[in-house]
Amino acid sequence: MFKPKLRGWVLGAAALAVSALLAVPAYAQKTRVTVYSALESDQIGPYKAAFEAANPDVEIAWVRDSTGVITARVLAEKDNPRADVIWGLGASSVALFDSMDMLQPYTPKGADQIKPAFRSTKNPMSWTGMDAWLAVMCYNTVEAPKKNMPKPTSWADLANPVYKDAIVMPNPASSGTGYQTVYAWIQIMGEKAAWEFMDKLHNNIAVYTHSGSAPCVQAAKGERMIGIGFDMRGAREKTAGAPIDIILAKEGAPWDMEATAIVKGTKNLAAAQKVADFAVSKGAYELYGKSYAIVGYPGMNPAPPNYPPSADAAMVKIDLSKMGADRAKILAEWTKRYDGKSAPK
């Protein structure tokens, strides 16, 4: 009687072992996708967790840096792409890649539900929009008055010599916020007048940072009196108790849109399409709304406390495709004139 029981136990154990071995390849088949992004560092963890919970067969490997660095990297890798997906990069950069035939056409599932302005006009689509962010002025209401520096209301005000060495803004070659600001000035003022304005502004700049968030943080701390920076960072600093006013310049607010796209040549197309699908889901837009006041899903109004009212009405009229196409020319001129005051990298 003992032998049959033993034989049954051995067979059962063997079956379990075989099942375990069969399960290993299934786990090993998880696809790893390389995602290039300029998202804020505190965003990528929640985005990865939400995507992988919905898609357990795909794992995201982030490559994160500032907009300028990621844009330059994608362009440098044009003939040998390393990224599978771009998720969270300025749409002006993504539009540039599109014009160079670097994106894989794909209309994500559910893309018809998002706002028309947040969709590529191509069919199939080449990219989809996530959210929009604006450039604002963050003015320290405690320290600046001590130095007899009045609260500005316009971009033109920043050329006033009273602000000498008191202003900080992002380097447009590094920061998307910086580039959208310089580009918008050219649209608002005209090219000649804009460069003349920037010559005067340069005299008042203490440093050009490599981050769109840093200027409002520095203004919030009283290290600089005025920061030209990312709208949501200003709102967060003010909500945390910083003595700053967040100002939309009366000439209009520079802006760009974050976008998602699949890189042409990806070896993981099916997995990349899952990222693109997730990026236009309602759940994804709820995540975007935790960091941005303007998102691409209808009916969502995620503006946080202390965010400037009617900000979307202040957005400067721009052509994202032209903004991308003019990038190299504008940055070359800006670097030649002003890069000497850039912070060390």
What is each of the regions a protein language model found here?
Residues S92-L96, A220, R224-P243:
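A ligand-binding cleft/hinge motif common to bilobed small-molecule-binding domains
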Residues Q29-A95:
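Early extracytoplasmic/lumenal segment of secretory-pathway proteins
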Residues L103-D112, W127-T128, A156, A242-P254, ...:
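Short beta-strand->loop
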Residues V162-P170, F197-H202, Y208-T209, A240-K264, A279-P302:
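Periplasmic-binding protein-like
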